[in-house]
């Protein structure tokens, strides 16, 4: 059985992950965070297998950055900052640099600017909306992009407005667990 998996000339993986008869498994299967973790584990497994087949070292793609923020700085500039995320299970996944993508007004994002440190000080023209997203990079590749943040300095500004994105919940649809009621109250 499973001849393809037993012949070493063909890379094969049999993955039995979730049971459609287990409700808890189905909740995991709907959770985007779980899907990301499983996909990353499969990617790492394939990378390690191919690396061992050819006797070559490997470097795992870094994780996306977090805590992206943009604030006004002196001289009509903006400071874009973020924090790298380390993969506690994979030391090779540490970022060696970052790519900051910029969009002006409703245009498309540019091809990105490489930086070594988790910050970028950039000039902004008044009255234009500047949007930023960041990826982490290393020899293994480029991470998924961060969320997008934006800043706009008006020429006749009367103050500064700070917008805080406190929404970071990404999950499956809500699943409510109820107690089984055995009361005869409905029959009364």
What are these regions (language model features)?
Residues 1-54:
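Active-site-adjacent mobile loop/cap segments within catalytic or ligand-binding domains
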Residues 19, 86, 166-169:
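Short, glycine/serine-rich, charged loops/turns that create anion-binding
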Residues 23-25, 90-91, 169-175:
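Short, solvent-exposed loop/turn elements at domain surfaces
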Residues 52-92, 142-157:
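Pro/Thr/Ser/Gly-rich low-complexity, intrinsically disordered linker/stalk tracts
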Residues 93-127:
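Recognizes extended acidic, P/S/T-rich segments that occur
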Residues 124-140:
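Beta-strand-rich modules
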Residues 151-171:
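Low-complexity, Pro/Ser/Thr- and charge-rich linker/hinge segments at domain boundaries
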Residues 181-187:
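Conserved small/polar residues in nucleotide/adenosyl-binding loops
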């Amino acid at each position: 059985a499973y001849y393809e998996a037993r012949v070493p000339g063909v890379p094969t993986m049999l993955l039995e992950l979730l049971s459609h008869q287990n409700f808890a498994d189905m909740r995991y299967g709907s959770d985007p965070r779980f899907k990301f973790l499983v996909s990353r584990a499969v990617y790492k497994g394939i990378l390690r297998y191919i690396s061992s087949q050819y006797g070559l070292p490997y470097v795992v793609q870094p994780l996306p950055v977090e805590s992206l923020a943009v604030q006004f700085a002196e001289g009509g500039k903006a400071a874009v900052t973020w924090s790298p995320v380390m993969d506690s299970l994979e030391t090779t996944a540490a970022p060696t640099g970052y790519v900051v993508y910029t969009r002006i007004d409703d245009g498309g994002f540019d091809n990105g600017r490489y930086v070594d440190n988790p910050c970028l000080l950039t000039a902004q023209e008044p009255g234009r909306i500047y949007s930023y997203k960041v990826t982490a990079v290393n020899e293994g590749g480029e991470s998924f992009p961060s969320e997008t943040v934006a800043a706009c300095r008006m020429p006749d500004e009367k103050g500064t407005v700070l917008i805080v994105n406190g929404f970071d919940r990404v999950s499956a649809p809500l699943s409510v667990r109820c107690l089984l009621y055995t009361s005869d109250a409905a029959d009364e």
